[in-house]
């Protein structure tokens, strides 16, 4: 695919007598289809496509954003040459970072090693598939010329940008608090990118949770009251809530759900870093198992810290109109009538739910990632937005399915003091009661609205997350 480009426009080591400006000028003339001395975005798209040059996602727009210095919507030769020179320098650094033994070639084992350092585990077979897409001469190694030719018009500037595609990011918020925290590189920590990404994720979570709050409240109502009447379906549940408290009541408890994002994220991130240090030796990179254990323990720590807010959210969601004037009034009444212990009702099933959720979520995501790399990573390791969102949504849904009975018991334990004549049962007692009176389906009451909110939550949080990253300077506009 790249032989024409290598042999005519970008000569290899055997033809280095041709100066870079001449190379760039020849290529520029090929792209300037109407010969007016400038290249617009449509000429760039058509020209690169006709030359068979591989492009990254939204490559043309990114090239123009970076290269069009005077912002006239066109690239003249000077702008074109400057962009390619600057981009080649960045790609040279990326090439050197992958070439671990400094022999001037990248091998499959070096790709595996480099990706492992950055937190992405792939097999050597998967690395060979990626290598084949870049390797033009069939040697199963990639030299500098092949690397440069492949990435010449791909705005990805370093290997870490490729890894960011495959990060199982918590920027995608579906309203659950059991996910494993994000992994940040040392450069991201030093540059302050980490807190910007966490802030972007927090804002995305707030918008996403607020947008899907009616479905979340319906889920809680079905978990708590569903056993009383088989008639509480989705339509009937919404009708009942609106009749009791009006449209605004659909968002009851959402304020607490949004407020707890900040302390929970902060504690989880801090705890995750501490547990990683305990589980790995200095200088050693964290593996998938250590990440799972550290993430689960960090989640448990964060949940311990903010759990009273989980109880408040449930009480507010289940409460009747006028029962509580707000979060602080609810806390005051619980403390007065039930004591401090009420703020940790349902804590044990909540804690137990972290392991199946986080473990299955991570395992399914890794499985989907491996499947994609094995079967579809022929031209790029960038899977595209839809694949990433689909993998994230599916893995999270599987995690929810496994941990849902524990989540339901937790919610009932949090709310059972509000239900008249309801016995105050512990976790085992509630499981027995539900199974004896409602059967296995009783452990999954409310799961339909819970699944219904996954797709809108993923879509909304992704859009807000990406826009917030641009606003905060994490990514370019």
From Swiss-Prot:
Compartment annotation: Mitochondrion inner membrane
Q: Where are the Solcar repeats?
A: 192-278, 286-371, 383-471
Q: Name one GO cellular component term.
A: mitochondrial inner membrane
Give the Gene3D superfamilies listed for this entry: EF-hand, Mitochondrial carrier domain
Q: Which reaction does it catalyse?
A: Mg(2+)(out) + phosphate(in) + ATP(out) = Mg(2+)(in) + phosphate(out) + ATP(in); ADP(out) + phosphate(in) + H(+)(out) = ADP(in) + phosphate(out) + H(+)(in); AMP(out) + phosphate(in) = AMP(in) + phosphate(out); phosphate(in) + ATP(out) + 2 H(+)(out) = phosphate(out) + ATP(in) + 2 H(+)(in)
Listed A to Z, the keywords are: Acetylation, Antiport, Calcium, Membrane, Metal-binding, Mitochondrion, Mitochondrion inner membrane, Repeat, Transmembrane, Transmembrane helix, Transport
Q: Where is this region: Regulatory N-terminal domain?
A: 1-173
Sites bearing N6-succinyllysine, chain numbering: 320, 437
Regarding protein family, the annotation reads: Belongs to the mitochondrial carrier (TC 2.A.29) family.
The protein depicted here goes by the name Mitochondrial adenyl nucleotide antiporter SLC25A24
UniProt gene name: SLC25A24
């Amino acid at each position: 695919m790249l032989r024409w480009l290598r042999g005519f426009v970008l000569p290899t080591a055997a033809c280095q007598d041709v100066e870079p400006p001449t190379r760039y000028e020849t290529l520029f003339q090929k792209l300037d289809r109407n010969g007016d001395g400038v290249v617009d975005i449509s000429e760039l798209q058509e020209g690169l496509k006709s030359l068979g040059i591989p492009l990254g996602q939204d490559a043309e727009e990114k090239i123009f954003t970076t290269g069009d210095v005077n912002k006239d919507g066109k690239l003249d030769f000077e702008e074109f040459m400057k962009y390619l020179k600057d981009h080649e320098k960045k790609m040279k650094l990326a090439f050197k970072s992958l070439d671990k033994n400094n022999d001037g070639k990248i091998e499959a084992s070096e790709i595996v090693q480099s990706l492992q350092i950055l937190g992405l585990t792939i097999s050597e077979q998967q690395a060979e598939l990626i290598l084949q897409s870049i390797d033009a001469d069939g040697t199963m190694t990639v030299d500098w010329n092949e690397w440069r030719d492949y990435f010449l018009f791909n705005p990805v500037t370093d290997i870490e940008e490729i890894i960011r595609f495959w990060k199982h990011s918590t920027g995608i918020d579906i309203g659950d608090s059991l996910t494993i925290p994000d992994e940040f590189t040392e450069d991201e920590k030093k540059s302050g990118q980490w807190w910007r990404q966490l802030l972007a994720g927090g804002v995305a979570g707030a918008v996403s949770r607020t947008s899907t709050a009616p479905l979340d409240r319906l889920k809680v109502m079905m978990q708590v009251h569903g056993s009383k009447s088989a008639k509480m379906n989705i339509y009937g549940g919404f009708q009942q809530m609106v009749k009791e408290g009006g449209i605004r009541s659909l968002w009851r408890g959402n304020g607490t759900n949004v407020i707890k994002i900040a302390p929970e994220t902060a504690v989880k991130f801090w705890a995750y870093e501490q547990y990683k240090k305990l589980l790995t030796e200095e200088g050693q990179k964290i593996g998938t198992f250590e990440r799972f254990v550290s993430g689960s323990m960090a989640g448990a720590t964060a949940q311990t810290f903010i759990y009273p807010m989980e109880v408040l959210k449930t009480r507010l969601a289940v409460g009747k109109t006028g029962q509580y004037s707000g979060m602080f009034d609810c806390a005051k009444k619980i403390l007065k009538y039930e004591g401090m212990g009420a703020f940790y009702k349902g804590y044990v099933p909540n804690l137990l739910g972290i392991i199946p959720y986080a473990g299955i979520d991570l395992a399914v995501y890794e499985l989907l990632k491996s499947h994609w790399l094995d079967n579809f990573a022929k031209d790029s390791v960038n899977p595209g937005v839809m694949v990433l969102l689909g993998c994230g949504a599916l893995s999270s849904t599987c995690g929810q399915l496994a941990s849902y009975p524990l989540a339901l018991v937790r919610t009932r334990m949090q709310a059972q003091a509000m239900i008249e004549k309801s016995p105050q049962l512990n976790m085992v007692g509630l499981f027995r009661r539900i199974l004896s009176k409602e059967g296995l389906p009783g452990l999954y009451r409310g799961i339909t609205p819970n699944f219904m909110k996954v797709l809108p939550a993923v879509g909304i949080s992704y859009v807000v997350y990406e826009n917030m990253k641009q606003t905060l300077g994490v990514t370019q506009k």
